[in-house]
């Protein structure tokens, strides 16, 4: 299924259900079993409200601020290296930032291990063989880690900052008034941590776009943020992230001459919808200015799901994604300068998540005050 009309149909709860729709290997790695993505109806809306409550404007800005601080610290290390793979280098500052923001204590000795676990859950989830097995193992270990933290929070062994994700999830109660099991609570806390670290994919694509469209970097370097939001949204529209989401037909029906039998798995093409010529003029062109006029609507622009976040299965963390991308674009444009050496910048379409083949290598990183060095 592809296109805004198909997306609107896909998010009709009377016709499609989410429970058990995603393949087991994806649920065992990327999503976790029992999490909000696989719920339906009132149970889904109740659980979703938990996540929406964490995404107030003040909290989103606070996470962005913390990420900016972590980026600045990371960049001091980048400057001591001849070159870095940007995608890989972004994981740790994102993990540090979101754990601090979420109230998840992270000892310095744990940072690398926990970051690897969070990355494995989205970077290797769709692989086969040993990488997929490592993703499953990372999921089990991360759930055990966070289950213990949630238990400690519930018995007041550790303090949870007001408004933190750890505190909110530890104290959340289901529709029956019962606290979430430790494992399900851990799955939901990972649904805060993991996708935040996965924003590294979008930031890598933003750096790719800044390199291929240097006029935009020049505008941001000059301090013109007028179209920063439009630039970030166009990166999210133009570049692939995870390509599709799944549902199962709740009751059989026919739509536009096509029969959907009960129980049939349906896939919504997220990337294809974001490149659909019925919604977007020149969909295969990178044109941020398009967002000055039209945002594609709730079912036409769906890089992280369609509909409304508080009702449908649209990611409630979209404001976080946008904020972190803005922080990163400003940082790459105004805080540091760097060279982009010869490399394979073609998109690895068969990879999930898709990325530039090289991972976006940058070289000779310097503080911006040393003067522009970006090779275009």
Residue spans for each PLM region:
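Cytochrome P450
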Residues: 1-376
């Amino acid at each position: 299924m592809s296109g805004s009309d198909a997306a609107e149909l896909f998010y009709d709860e009377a016709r499609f259900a989410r429970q058990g729709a995603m393949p087991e290997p994806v649920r065992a790695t990327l999503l976790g079993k029992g999490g909000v993505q696989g719920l339906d109806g009132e149970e889904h809306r109740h659980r979703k409200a938990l996540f929406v409550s964490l995404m107030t404007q003040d909290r989103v800005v606070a996470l962005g601020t913390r990420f900016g601080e972590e980026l600045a610290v990371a960049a001091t290390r980048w400057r001591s290296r001849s070159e870095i793979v940007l995608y890989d280098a972004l994981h740790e500052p994102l993990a540090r930032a979101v754990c601090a923001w979420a109230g998840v204590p992270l000892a310095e000795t744990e940072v690398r291990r926990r970051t690897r676990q969070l990355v494995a859950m989205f970077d290797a989830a769709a692989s086969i063989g040993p990488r997929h097995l490592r993703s499953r193992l990372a999921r089990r270990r991360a759930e055990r880690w966070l289950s213990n933290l949630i238990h400690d929070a519930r018995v007041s062994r550790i303090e949870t900052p007001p408004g933190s994700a750890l505190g909110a999830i530890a104290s959340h109660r289901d529709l029956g008034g019962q606290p979430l099991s430790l494992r399900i609570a851990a799955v939901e806390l990972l649904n805060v941590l993991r996708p935040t670290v996965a924003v590294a994919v979008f930031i890598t694509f933003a750096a790719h776009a800044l390199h291929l469209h240097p006029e935009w970097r020049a505008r941001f370097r000059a301090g013109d943020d007028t179209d920063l939001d439009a630039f970030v949204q166009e990166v999210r529209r133009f570049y692939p992230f995870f390509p599709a989401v799944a549902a199962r037909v709740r009751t059989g029906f026919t739509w536009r001459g096509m029969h959907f039998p009960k129980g049939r798995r349906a896939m919504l093409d997220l990337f294809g919808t974001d490149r659909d010529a019925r919604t977007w003029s020149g969909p295969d062109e990178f044109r941020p200015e398009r967002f000055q006029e039209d945002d594609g609507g709730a079912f036409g622009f769906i890089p992280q799901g369609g509909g409304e976040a508080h009702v449908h299965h649209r990611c409630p963390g979209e404001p976080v994604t946008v904020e972190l991308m803005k922080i990163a674009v400003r940082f790459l444009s105004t805080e540091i300068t760097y060279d982009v050496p010869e490399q394979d910048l073609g998109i690895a379409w068969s990879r999930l998540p898709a990325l530039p083949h090289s991972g976006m290598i940058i070289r000779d990183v310097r503080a911006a005050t040393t003067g522009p060095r970006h090779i275009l």
